Regions:
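Cytoplasmic helix-loop-helix junction between adjacent transmembrane helices
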Residues: 118-155
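Cytoplasmic membrane-interface "Motif A"-like loop-to-helix N-cap segments
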Residues: 84-96, 312-325
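Conserved MFS/SLC helix-loop-helix module at the cytosolic interface between two early adjacent transmembrane helices
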Residues: 74-113
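Helix-to-loop junctions at the C-terminal end of transmembrane segments
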Residues: 75-87, 303-316
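Glycine-rich segments within core transmembrane alpha-helices of 12-TM secondary carriers
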Residues: 150-172, 194-195, 384-394
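Extracytoplasmic gate region of multi-pass secondary transporters
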Residues: 43-44, 245-304, 360, 364, ...
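C-terminal transmembrane helical hairpin of 12-TM major facilitator-type secondary transporters
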Residues: 317-366
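Helix-breaking motifs and short loop linkers at transmembrane-helix boundaries and internal kinks
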Residues: 55, 87, 108-114, 125, ...
Length: 443
């Protein structure tokens, strides 16, 4: 079974080689990404119990949920630069162990202030993880195969949403009161420890770069290095940016930064508040809330894979991304419109999540065709750093609106408008983000 479609490659030899690499690294990175997303958004479920225990208002929760991204943004670029210096294996392992410890420590939150501090520190600890993973894939897979690789990883968001909702609801409902701990405290403990354990595994399992890895033959190592070096030269000759100064002057890159910002506003604005949105649709147990919260992520995951495969097969990025963002915009607007009609609201949330997740994995395949060398890592980190400000702004905005008006749907309309702007910007991006030549076609 191929993780990356046969139609993506020029030859059966390339297909076999790069799928062998994909099977080696993608399933493991997928697990890491699932754990990362669970640790990032489980606070949305914890709120259903901890708000009363800790004294969190809707605005305080929104601020605390979003302040994670301030820490994340401040340390994003330094973290990615350190990864290039010390190597992916050591740095990703460090990230996971530290964030797992801090995530577990969330069980000791007792006041809004301690909630803010630990959420900020969690962002600092996790800074560099996703752009580091994206950068790591550029070391192993050619650009024309990266969208499907990113789709496999981004599927971790959907999978985490599918299992995270029911799991979180079950933990909070089942363990509440056990050994004197509240259900939300057990949630942070049981979902934080896996990151620490996996961080240790990372150090022994991942290899920094191709060239001398034991699970490839000498000829295969040499071919991967040659393919990726040739691709780098082709991008440089075609005008891909190499220097840091040029990266910051690249207009298309700043367009991608804005698009990523808008997408993250929508995704995290919904993800952090999804349990509350679902809860408002009718009376449910915590487990039922978790099960219903899983539905949009399940639908989004399927759509993301289909769009990612089609984008790689046609080697087109811009329109796949812009139309997906437009679908997210429509879903957000409809979910606000039908907030009193459970089935229609849930269907609209499915459309919003399908559009967001589909756009993400296509969007993140573009920077590698615009940038090369040191500019690649910094460009990716720039997209994530500025984009993740949306992860701070949207949960706080949703909390402020909820506390001021008593309605979350006004916030959903604002997120829909922002996604509409992003779809229009993405449609105007002119770069190599359209069709890209396959590695191996060059003489």
């Amino acid at each position: 079974m191929n993780l990356i479609s046969r139609n993506t490659f020029v030859s059966d030899q390339d297909c076999s080689l790069y799928n062998r690499i994909a099977w080696r690294i993608l399933p493991f990175l997928f697990v890491l990404y699932v754990v990362a997303f669970l640790d990032r958004v489980n606070v949305g479920f914890a709120k259903l119990q901890m708000a009363a225990d800790v004294g969190l208002s809707d605005m305080a929760f929104g601020f605390g949920a979003g302040v994670f991204f301030l820490g994340y943004c401040l340390f994003e670029i330094p973290s990615n630069m350190m990864m290039q210096r010390v190597g992916a294996r050591l740095w990703i392992a460090r990230i996971m162990v530290v964030w797992g410890i801090i995530s577990t420590s969330m069980m000791f939150v007792s006041t809004p202030t301690s909630f803010y501090i630990l959420r900020f520190l969690l962002g600092v600890a996790e800074a560099g993880f996703y752009p580091g993973i994206v950068l790591y894939l550029t070391y192993w897979l050619p650009s024309y195969a990266q969208s499907q690789g990113l789709a496999c990883l981004s599927l971790g968001v959907g999978f985490a949403g599918v299992i995270g909702g029911p799991l979180s609801g079950w933990i909070m409902q089942t363990f509440a009161g056990m050994h004197g701990l509240a259900g939300w405290q057990w949630l942070f403990l049981l979902e934080g420890l896996p990151a620490v354990l996996l961080g240790i595994v990372v150090f022994f399992y991942l290899d920094d770069r191709p060239g001398k890895v034991r699970w490839l033959s000498a000829a295969q190592n040499a071919k991967v290095v040659a393919d990726l070096d040739r691709q780098r030269r082709e991008h440089e000759q075609a005008g891909a940016t190499h220097t840091l100064r040029s990266a910051f002057r690249h207009r298309a890159l700043w367009c991608l930064v804005f698009v990523n910002f808008a997408l993250l506003c929508g995704t995290y604005g919904v993800s952090f508040w999804l349990p509350q949105i679902i809860r408002n649709l009718g009376e449910q147990t915590l487990l039922e809330t978790g099960l219903l919260s899983a539905v949009p992520f399940a639908v989004g995951s399927v759509c993301m894979l289909l769009v990612g495969k089609h984008s790689d097969r046609t080697r087109e990025r811009r329109w796949h991304a812009s139309l997906s963002i437009l679908a997210a915009c429509l879903g957000l607007a409809l979910s606000a419109t039908f907030h009193n009609q459970p089935l229609l609201c849930l269907a609209s949330l499915c459309l919003a999540m399908a559009g967001s997740l589909s756009a993400f994995n296509v969007l993140w395949a573009i920077p590698g065709t615009l940038l090369t060398g040191a500019a690649t890592g910094v460009g990716i980190a720039l997209m994530t750093t500025v984009g993740n400000l949306g992860g701070y702004a949207s949960p706080f905005m949703m909390g402020w609106i909820k506390q001021s008006s008593g309605h979350l749907e006004y916030g959903l309309f604002i997120l829909a408008a922002l996604n509409l702007a992003a779809a229009l910007v993405m449609a105007r991006v002119r770069s190599q983000a359209g069709p890209v030549a396959a590695v191996g076609t060059a003489g």
